[in-house]
A protein has these predicted regions:
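Helix-rich interaction surfaces within compact, conserved domain-sized segments
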Residues: 100, 104-107
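N-terminal intrinsically disordered, cationic/polar leader segments
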Residues: 1-97, 113-130
Length: 130
């Protein structure tokens, strides 16, 4: 599959070491996908394949800190004119992994600086159940 990717955008990244006790947090990392419509009726661009905005909103509460945010990227799937849900799980994972890697990288760097010790390495496993 031929893919044109734009830069990854960190829409929001929040890091907190002060957490209120007994405040329950549900760790979550989600995948949101929205079809992008062309601006100014750019039909030529759309004729090359569907364009999607992939967004990963997340909230993770770990032992010493909490992070939350949104990271996104716009992609075009060349010669693909179906729905995003038509893609195989492996393709969806390949399209979303660079965003997950960004969350890991930012978190490692921020925790390394904040705690003045080696950063925290996050480990995510894909959930193909929905």
């Amino acid at each position: 599959m031929d893919i044109v990717t734009n830069k990854i955008v960190v829409e929001k990244y929040n890091f907190e070491t002060t957490m209120e006790e007994n405040q329950p947090f549900e760790n979550k990392i989600e995948l949101e996908v929205h079809e992008v419509e062309p601006v100014d009726g750019n039909v030529e661009l759309m004729a090359k394949g569907k364009i999607f905005k992939i967004t990963i909103p997340f909230l993770l509460a770990l032992e010493n800190f909490r992070i939350d945010g949104r990271i996104s990227r716009i992609i075009q799937l060349k010669d693909f004119f179906g729905q995003f849900s038509d893609l195989e799980a492996a393709d969806v994972e390949a399209l979303s992994n660079p965003l997950i890697d960004y969350i890991k990288r930012i978190t490692y760097d921020v925790t390394e600086i904040a705690f003045d010790e080696p950063g925290v390495s996050l480990d995510f496993n894909a959930n193909h159940d929905g």
